[in-house]
Amino acid sequence: MSKTKKILVVTCTKNDGKDTQLLKSMAPLSDDVKMVVNINNKCGLSKAYNKQLTPENLVYHDIVLFVHDDVYVDDLKLKGKLYTAINELEYDIVGLAGAGEIKITKPCLWHRMSRQESWSGAVSHQMELDGESKLNVTSFGPWPRRCLIMDGLFLAVDLKRVLEVGWKFNENYDFHHYDISSCLDANSKKLKMGTYPIYVTHDSPGLKDYNEPTYQQSEMRFYNEYKRG
Protein backbone atom coordinates (compact mmCIF):
# COMPACT_ATOMS: atom_id res chain seq x y z
CA MET A 1 0.00 0.00 0.00
CA SER A 2 1.34 3.41 -0.92
CA LYS A 3 1.84 5.90 1.87
CA THR A 4 -1.02 8.37 2.18
CA LYS A 5 -0.32 12.07 2.03
CA LYS A 6 -0.79 14.47 4.91
CA ILE A 7 -4.13 16.21 5.31
CA LEU A 8 -3.87 19.93 4.55
CA VAL A 9 -5.79 21.66 7.37
CA VAL A 10 -6.87 25.22 6.60
CA THR A 11 -8.33 27.70 9.07
CA CYS A 12 -8.80 31.43 9.57
CA THR A 13 -8.43 33.39 12.80
CA LYS A 14 -8.79 37.02 13.80
CA ASN A 15 -5.60 36.92 15.90
CA ASP A 16 -2.28 35.05 15.80
CA GLY A 17 -4.05 31.71 16.17
CA LYS A 18 -1.68 30.29 18.76
CA ASP A 19 -4.32 29.80 21.45
CA THR A 20 -7.12 28.52 19.25
CA GLN A 21 -8.87 25.26 20.03
CA LEU A 22 -8.00 23.93 16.59
CA LEU A 23 -4.24 24.40 16.92
CA LYS A 24 -4.25 22.84 20.36
CA SER A 25 -6.02 19.78 19.00
CA MET A 26 -3.67 19.42 16.03
CA ALA A 27 -0.53 18.99 18.16
CA PRO A 28 -0.96 15.18 18.59
CA LEU A 29 -1.70 14.87 14.85
CA SER A 30 1.44 16.58 13.58
CA ASP A 31 2.53 13.47 11.64
CA ASP A 32 -0.81 13.38 9.81
CA VAL A 33 -1.52 17.02 9.00
CA LYS A 34 -0.01 20.20 7.66
CA MET A 35 -1.51 23.45 8.92
CA VAL A 36 -2.30 26.61 6.98
CA VAL A 37 -3.43 29.32 9.40
CA ASN A 38 -4.66 32.61 7.98
CA ILE A 39 -3.79 34.86 10.93
CA ASN A 40 -5.31 38.30 11.52
CA ASN A 41 -7.77 37.36 8.81
CA LYS A 42 -10.02 40.10 7.45
CA CYS A 43 -11.32 38.55 4.23
CA GLY A 44 -14.27 36.21 3.83
CA LEU A 45 -13.80 32.52 4.55
CA SER A 46 -14.66 31.55 0.99
CA LYS A 47 -11.91 33.70 -0.51
CA ALA A 48 -9.35 32.52 2.05
CA TYR A 49 -10.31 28.87 1.56
CA ASN A 50 -10.28 29.04 -2.23
CA LYS A 51 -6.63 30.06 -2.20
CA GLN A 52 -5.80 26.50 -1.12
CA LEU A 53 -7.77 24.76 -3.88
CA THR A 54 -4.81 24.63 -6.27
CA PRO A 55 -3.05 22.04 -8.45
CA GLU A 56 0.15 22.89 -6.59
CA ASN A 57 -1.30 21.58 -3.33
CA LEU A 58 -2.30 18.36 -5.07
CA VAL A 59 1.38 17.41 -5.27
CA TYR A 60 1.53 16.99 -1.49
CA HIS A 61 -2.10 16.57 -0.41
CA ASP A 62 -5.07 14.47 -1.52
CA ILE A 63 -7.43 15.97 1.04
CA VAL A 64 -7.91 19.55 2.20
CA LEU A 65 -9.81 20.09 5.46
CA PHE A 66 -11.41 23.49 6.04
CA VAL A 67 -12.28 23.92 9.70
CA HIS A 68 -13.20 26.77 12.03
CA ASP A 69 -10.55 27.83 14.54
CA ASP A 70 -12.88 27.24 17.51
CA VAL A 71 -13.19 23.52 16.75
CA TYR A 72 -11.24 21.02 18.86
CA VAL A 73 -10.69 17.84 16.84
CA ASP A 74 -10.74 15.09 19.47
CA ASP A 75 -10.05 12.20 17.11
CA LEU A 76 -6.61 10.64 16.64
CA LYS A 77 -7.98 8.67 13.67
CA LEU A 78 -8.76 11.85 11.71
CA LYS A 79 -6.51 11.06 8.76
CA GLY A 80 -7.62 7.46 8.37
CA LYS A 81 -11.28 8.36 8.68
CA LEU A 82 -11.08 11.04 6.01
CA TYR A 83 -9.32 8.68 3.61
CA THR A 84 -11.96 6.03 4.33
CA ALA A 85 -14.81 8.46 3.68
CA ILE A 86 -13.28 9.57 0.39
CA ASN A 87 -11.78 6.32 -0.92
CA GLU A 88 -14.32 3.76 0.32
CA LEU A 89 -17.56 5.73 0.55
CA GLU A 90 -16.49 7.81 -2.46
CA TYR A 91 -17.44 11.11 -0.84
CA ASP A 92 -16.03 14.17 -2.57
CA ILE A 93 -16.84 16.42 0.39
CA VAL A 94 -16.97 15.18 3.99
CA GLY A 95 -18.71 16.94 6.87
CA LEU A 96 -19.90 16.33 10.42
CA ALA A 97 -23.49 17.59 10.37
CA GLY A 98 -26.00 18.15 7.62
CA ALA A 99 -29.22 17.17 5.89
CA GLY A 100 -30.15 15.10 2.88
CA GLU A 101 -32.76 17.55 1.62
CA ILE A 102 -33.51 21.24 1.52
CA LYS A 103 -36.47 23.53 0.94
CA ILE A 104 -35.37 27.15 0.62
CA THR A 105 -37.31 29.03 3.30
CA LYS A 106 -36.46 31.67 5.87
CA PRO A 107 -34.60 31.56 8.17
CA CYS A 108 -32.03 30.13 5.76
CA LEU A 109 -30.29 27.73 8.16
CA TRP A 110 -29.65 24.13 7.16
CA HIS A 111 -31.54 22.64 10.11
CA ARG A 112 -34.50 24.98 9.54
CA MET A 113 -34.78 24.22 5.82
CA SER A 114 -34.90 20.43 6.16
CA ARG A 115 -36.91 17.72 7.89
CA GLN A 116 -35.31 16.19 10.97
CA GLU A 117 -35.64 12.75 9.39
CA SER A 118 -33.00 13.78 6.85
CA TRP A 119 -30.46 15.04 9.41
CA SER A 120 -27.13 13.35 10.00
CA GLY A 121 -24.09 13.72 12.24
CA ALA A 122 -23.06 14.86 15.70
CA VAL A 123 -21.08 17.71 17.27
CA SER A 124 -20.11 18.27 20.92
CA HIS A 125 -20.35 21.65 22.66
CA GLN A 126 -19.05 22.93 25.99
CA MET A 127 -21.63 23.81 28.63
CA GLU A 128 -21.73 24.79 32.30
CA LEU A 129 -23.60 22.50 34.71
CA ASP A 130 -23.54 22.85 38.51
CA GLY A 131 -20.58 25.18 38.24
CA GLU A 132 -18.54 22.72 36.20
CA SER A 133 -17.62 22.51 32.53
CA LYS A 134 -19.34 19.62 30.75
CA LEU A 135 -19.66 18.30 27.22
CA ASN A 136 -23.07 18.18 25.58
CA VAL A 137 -23.30 16.09 22.41
CA THR A 138 -25.81 17.28 19.82
CA SER A 139 -26.81 14.22 17.82
CA PHE A 140 -28.53 15.22 14.60
CA GLY A 141 -28.98 11.75 13.13
CA PRO A 142 -27.24 8.58 11.92
CA TRP A 143 -23.90 8.76 10.16
CA PRO A 144 -22.19 8.19 7.79
CA ARG A 145 -24.94 9.38 5.46
CA ARG A 146 -25.26 11.16 2.14
CA CYS A 147 -26.12 14.85 2.46
CA LEU A 148 -27.16 17.72 0.23
CA ILE A 149 -26.12 20.48 2.63
CA MET A 150 -23.63 20.44 5.51
CA ASP A 151 -22.43 22.75 8.26
CA GLY A 152 -19.24 24.64 7.48
CA LEU A 153 -17.54 24.14 10.85
CA PHE A 154 -15.72 21.16 9.26
CA LEU A 155 -15.60 20.38 5.54
CA ALA A 156 -12.96 18.14 3.95
CA VAL A 157 -12.65 17.90 0.17
CA ASP A 158 -11.11 15.47 -2.29
CA LEU A 159 -8.80 18.00 -3.90
CA LYS A 160 -8.41 16.18 -7.20
CA ARG A 161 -12.17 15.83 -7.70
CA VAL A 162 -13.07 19.42 -6.90
CA LEU A 163 -10.34 20.66 -9.22
CA GLU A 164 -11.63 18.37 -11.99
CA VAL A 165 -15.13 19.84 -11.85
CA GLY A 166 -14.07 23.41 -11.09
CA TRP A 167 -15.81 23.65 -7.73
CA LYS A 168 -14.92 26.37 -5.23
CA PHE A 169 -16.49 27.96 -2.19
CA ASN A 170 -19.08 30.57 -3.14
CA GLU A 171 -17.35 33.93 -2.73
CA ASN A 172 -20.67 35.79 -2.68
CA TYR A 173 -20.75 34.87 1.02
CA ASP A 174 -18.09 35.84 3.55
CA PHE A 175 -19.34 33.80 6.50
CA HIS A 176 -23.08 33.31 6.83
CA HIS A 177 -24.38 30.90 4.17
CA TYR A 178 -20.98 30.26 2.60
CA ASP A 179 -21.28 26.60 3.58
CA ILE A 180 -24.77 25.74 2.37
CA SER A 181 -24.42 27.79 -0.82
CA SER A 182 -21.15 26.00 -1.59
CA CYS A 183 -22.79 22.63 -0.90
CA LEU A 184 -25.62 23.41 -3.31
CA ASP A 185 -23.04 24.44 -5.91
CA ALA A 186 -21.20 21.16 -5.31
CA ASN A 187 -24.41 19.20 -5.83
CA SER A 188 -25.00 20.99 -9.14
CA LYS A 189 -21.55 19.75 -10.21
CA LYS A 190 -22.47 16.15 -9.25
CA LEU A 191 -20.10 16.01 -6.29
CA LYS A 192 -21.00 13.44 -3.64
CA MET A 193 -21.27 14.77 -0.09
CA GLY A 194 -21.80 13.09 3.23
CA THR A 195 -21.12 12.94 6.94
CA TYR A 196 -18.64 10.67 8.67
CA PRO A 197 -18.16 9.95 12.42
CA ILE A 198 -15.28 12.23 13.36
CA TYR A 199 -15.39 13.60 16.89
CA VAL A 200 -15.00 17.31 17.63
CA THR A 201 -16.01 19.90 20.20
CA HIS A 202 -17.21 23.23 18.83
CA ASP A 203 -16.65 26.18 21.15
CA SER A 204 -19.46 28.27 19.67
CA PRO A 205 -23.13 28.74 20.57
CA GLY A 206 -24.06 29.32 16.94
CA LEU A 207 -26.05 32.23 15.57
CA LYS A 208 -27.39 34.29 18.46
CA ASP A 209 -29.51 36.87 16.65
CA TYR A 210 -31.38 36.28 13.39
CA ASN A 211 -32.00 40.02 13.15
CA GLU A 212 -28.32 40.94 13.09
CA PRO A 213 -27.86 43.13 9.95
CA THR A 214 -24.95 41.17 8.48
CA TYR A 215 -26.90 37.93 8.78
CA GLN A 216 -30.04 39.46 7.29
CA GLN A 217 -28.15 40.79 4.27
CA SER A 218 -26.54 37.41 3.68
CA GLU A 219 -29.84 35.59 4.07
CA MET A 220 -31.54 37.82 1.50
CA ARG A 221 -28.70 37.24 -0.95
CA PHE A 222 -28.84 33.48 -0.43
CA TYR A 223 -32.63 33.34 -0.68
CA ASN A 224 -32.66 35.27 -3.94
CA GLU A 225 -29.84 33.22 -5.45
CA TYR A 226 -31.09 29.73 -4.60
CA LYS A 227 -34.85 29.99 -4.27
CA ARG A 228 -36.53 27.85 -6.92
CA GLY A 229 -39.97 28.60 -8.25
Description of each model-found segment:
Residues 5-11, 34-37:
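Hydrophobic targeting segments
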Residues 11, 15-30:
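Short, well-formed alpha-helical segments that are part of the catalytic scaffolds
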Residues 42-56:
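Glycine-rich, basic loop-to-helix element that forms the pyrophosphate-binding segment
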Residues 61-72:
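Short beta-strand-to-loop acidic/aromatic patch adjacent to the donor-nucleotide binding site
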Residues 71-85:
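Acidic donor-binding/catalytic loop of UDP-sugar-dependent glycosyltransferases
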Residues 82-165:
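Conserved catalytic core of nucleotide-sugar-dependent glycosyltransferases
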Residues 164-172:
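Conserved nucleotide-sugar donor-binding catalytic segment
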Residues 171-229:
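C-terminal catalytic/acceptor-binding lobe
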